[in-house]
């Protein structure tokens, strides 16, 4: 890299959007135009960065968050596509090959490993590693080993290096699905990246979540690989120990995107000390180098250099560019450029890739295995993923079986006469509609980051995964579909022939797969789930309306008729109808006109079958005539349609694969701080004045920091007064066991200890030792077999324990739409007793904001990573949320320094120390404590493998007590400048490859220290229990506040999340607005003929069907709040779970009422029906108010009874299909089996539909079109009116030509109420139905 600079669009400071921006759209547009120039403002991401990393070298990249370390690695790896408006200048080459050419032809050799651990959670560790190894399996292997031997050898190699052998059969998991520990998941990520076999690795904070010993082993493993294989490694490490630092050859230091040093690791410290900065005692070199870039960092300045050393990023950069070290670097780069043989490098790469590529791989492809092998491997992985998540498949299959029984029995043995024709069409349409609804459940975005990572690793084409997912999921979908069609087909009494059955089976399968692929194609085009659900909702409407069941081809308007031809369901429905009705003779039954009293002996030529497709004088209707007249269908098109569906299926699959392959990730301009609406200008002015002051007084600030650093660290600030704990927490012989495939697995083994007020206890151990498990067990957050005693002041814990303790989780989970201050205020109000005045709570919140130094971003929205708070700010918020609850018993913290740089980690631990000195009791797990961090703790609990205690006791001054314990029990002597934490972990054999002879858990059990601790615990229990027996149960309430108080504040929080989630609100608005227009203009001017009555029915039916995609939207949004509550808020007993559901419901209502009003206007009036207020207002009341009240509640009820969102989508499809089946639209109640008529009465959709249709049809005169009239001849000498007069005394309809003596034209309906009666509805039921609803 030579003089590389990167610029991107400056989105670092944004103002959050709200729904108010839409309500005030004109002003929003004007404001947007005014700020257009600022939106295009560029910011420096990297400036003038140079580096020479030779083969076999390791380069450490240091800098604070926001310094540009990640951007530096991405630039080096060629992963700059996510830089919005990014402009890269300078020169980047790889042994002489320019970066552009490298990315085109040799990309697999450059690997970027991101900080986040994204994996398929339901795959095991073994399956995850095997897949990565298989994708990079060379065609020519050493000693001609088999593929299986190659995979096994490599898997065991990586597992041994990173200590993953014992986790092979454990799921990888994620934040919401249990699996391996966070540290083990990071090791899986590292092993997977190494399996990608790059020659240049860019590791972004790869040691995050690893304990010190494993982090060191990682560094040494990379060191070994660079030495043996000649690879190059660029690594960012936020908390690097001295041992880790010494494994690197070179180091570069970044400060606000500027490079301030690049050279050998042995020279960096001298460079900055010569500059004037001194390294404090026992501070590692990496900490020292990072601290220099922090104005508030822990560093000292040589006497006399206070006003000479650089302070700002620009000053540091200028010093570096003028230094002899920089000149030497430039010289080395120029020399290497002249020495490198580019052509030889290309030849080597080409030869290597040629030997590795398997047969069938394209010559220009940079993937190792062929495209077909990629599909095979991804398909196998797909089967394993589905098998690992059995609940979805089980729910899907059970739903299909249940739906088949219900629908089949609903249409049980449909009449073979004309009376059953509509039912037979309905059951076929419904089967297609059900699997269309199921297709909505396949819209998912959770795996997109994994595909992007694997694309970076060059494991496989993203399109290969798209094709493989289709293949792997097909058999599992077929299980449910097969049961569905068998049960439905025979219960409904469809055409009993093998040919017809298998034709139906084939057509339903083909259509189901095509529609599923269509929805997956839609999702591959979209950036967000809300966006995909909105588009899918409109597609769903198209599928339902233009299948030709609801509105037939002759009735379609030309502006939308084309839609019918581009959807597979239209062709499937035609072919299924042909298979069912071809050659069928349908007896007219009760549809002969005239008939009844007085017409018993009438001749056949004087009657007609009042049914579509009838012929004069014929008492039956041929199925082919019916299809031709009603739908314009021809039997000869049956297998033509099958071919067309094949084309649709292949087309959708191919398009999805193409979109997946070339879809770019969402671009960004780096971390963006998003502030609350209306606060941007004030905050910008504050920041501007602050920055100016810092620049003018930088040297004074640095000198102040020197004085602070040298002051007494144990001084207690008055800010922390009132934070003291009031109880002693004791745990004795705590064990935790979970079920395992091999029996019971013990994760904790007789762990004992205690926390007293005023102490800071460290919980340390290697990754997977059980640190988080112990923390969760003590905090009452684990589910399993727990034995032992956990006592508060010597007594068993009561219901108030959870709310009296604070728990800072490793994952920083917060409500994205709230500001930092609002998040803290909500926690304070929910966690502290209601008796405390609100003003006092808010004052305390301000105090915590000041303590944690969050004033600068207190009005910023939490947002998401990259578009909201950064990692450090999120961690501070996580701690603050617990502190404002003022836990009076204990504060648990799980890895509070994970993901932070050394300076941020130092600030967090120092703050914890001050809390402890103020009287707080703290138990904290920590992975990579430096010497300076470790010595801030008072007491240590050390866990070994299997959750066994190795040490519990005082750490001592300069860690003397704990060091003395290990040295006297056989460990080597600890060096004076050695990190005690690393020494301890090394002594006990922590790490993947380490081993020791001593049995440290056994040594502890037999030690004098263990006896003393046990005795002390017993004495404490005895003394405390005797002094606390007089306490009352006033604290034992589960919640700190009343239900009504919780309701008020949870409702307020929920309303803010809706108001500020513009993407969700806009998606909802677009769905209802576009759907309204779509329905309105599909059934535009329904007319007064008979088909207009049917169209009116289906227009109302489709208005109800809108609830399906709208329900998916509601559930997708509610899932975010539900998961946050389950993972964090419920564990602290903040508020009752029911309030989450109730407040979400109440906040959905106003938006649905507004948007359903838009839907009403855009759909009702285009129909050309009654516009007087007496009808339209009641229609509005029924649909835009009552119906919205109903299905919002239904959506939330289903979600809260489901294990996850995907399962909820399946259940929604099942329940809505159930409700729509029995509402009377596709099967009139008169044709339902007697058993199911209760369900017709029980379904709320029945009454909604009856009201909507009744308002449209009551007193509406009907005038049949010419083709709707049925013709017959009266007896000789009689007119049509005279002949049919007795019939109309009890029959419906009218004669269009009563004075004619031949060709009597009969219309089936005279007024809309007659059609209502046929579907068992009546306008008179209107207010009765309102009561039922």
From Swiss-Prot:
Glycans are attached at residues 48, 144, 205, 350, 697, 733, 958, 1320. The keyword Cell inner membrane does not apply. It is a multi-pass membrane protein. Keywords: ATP-binding, Glycoprotein, Membrane, Nucleotide-binding, Repeat, Transmembrane, Transmembrane helix, Transport. GO terms for cellular component: cytosol; mitochondrion; plasma membrane. This is ABC transporter ATP-binding protein/permease PDR18. Belongs to the ABC transporter superfamily. ABCG family. PDR (TC 3.A.1.205) subfamily. Gene3D superfamilies: P-loop containing nucleotide triphosphate hydrolases (3.40.50.300). GO terms for biological process: cellular response to xenobiotic stimulus; response to xenobiotic stimulus; sterol homeostasis. CDD domains: ABCG_PDR_domain1 (cd03233), ABCG_PDR_domain2 (cd03232). It is found in: Membrane. It comes from the Eukaryota. Pfam families: ABC2_membrane, ABC2_membrane_7, ABC_tran, PDR_CDR. The chain crosses the membrane at residues 13-33, 392-412, 425-445, 474-494, 499-519, 534-554, 642-662, 1071-1091, 1092-1112, 1150-1170, 1178-1198, 1210-1230, 1235-1255. ATP binds at residues 765-772. Residues 30-281, 729-971 form the ABC transporter domain. The gene is PDR18. One of its GO terms (molecular function) is ATP hydrolysis activity.
